[in-house]
């Protein structure tokens, strides 16, 4: 990792101290810093490195147009975000491990920036050879697990036993969490899935109610109601998390709530578009002026 072990971000929520090595976050909100001192970059950024994926999940909302981001351009964007106060970057896709320089990008972010490095993967390419290149270069790994056992195999078309084997390799490299798409097919697996997460040592269980796509209408109201009740009664040891778009409905607590919108989060698509989230189709193209110029342009779009 970079010699920088901690970072201080100033924004509308206060002064935010963050250590990417330990994961410690401390928000000093007793005094509101003047607006002129606020950092300009979003607190967190996600980047779809490529649209390529070798799974065909019916509910996937990622674009299917072939696109892969250039390594050198990506490095420039990461440096910009770092210099302007972002705390972390999450690589996704598609399947990020299919980017030809995936390991190099993780190394650049770890060695040349002070950003916390995470990525989301289906996990099946995270074999020991690749994982050995990621040691000390990623801070957290998210594995997508929609359903468990036979449900997982039906929806993802891959062996659940193979997924478990990859998971056990992953946990030797970095702390990990499980991403769980909630819909009519998976909601009955919630209890078994959270038990599995606990038994395997997951640090977080991210609930992702299915988003609507041109092919599917998203999670139904009946399933939403069941999910809300499940969250309300949850008493397990694995930390629950939820996407920002569903946070209010599921009663999530956000200590940085004053830092919302583009101050909290932004997404870059594999087509080099800066967006407010990965679920949105609108955004602005990132041109030669850089990603911060694109951010200023996006802020003007209501």
State what each model feature region is:
Residues 17, 87-88, 117, 141, ...:
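N-terminal hydrophobic or amphipathic segments with adjacent small-residue motifs
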Residues 60, 68, 116, 163, ...:
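Secondary-structure transition/capping residues
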Residues 137-140, 144, 150-275, 279-292:
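Radical SAM enzyme [4Fe-4S]-AdoMet core and its adjacent flexible, acidic
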Residues 9-10, 19, 23-121, 125-132, ...:
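Conserved alpha-helical substructure of the radical SAM core
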Residues 1-64, 82, 253, 257-279, ...:
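N-terminal pre-core extensions flanking Radical SAM catalytic domains
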Residues 7-8, 67, 142, 195:
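Alpha-helical interaction segments
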Residues 122, 201-202, 213-214, 298-301:
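Short, intrinsically disordered/low-complexity patches at protein termini
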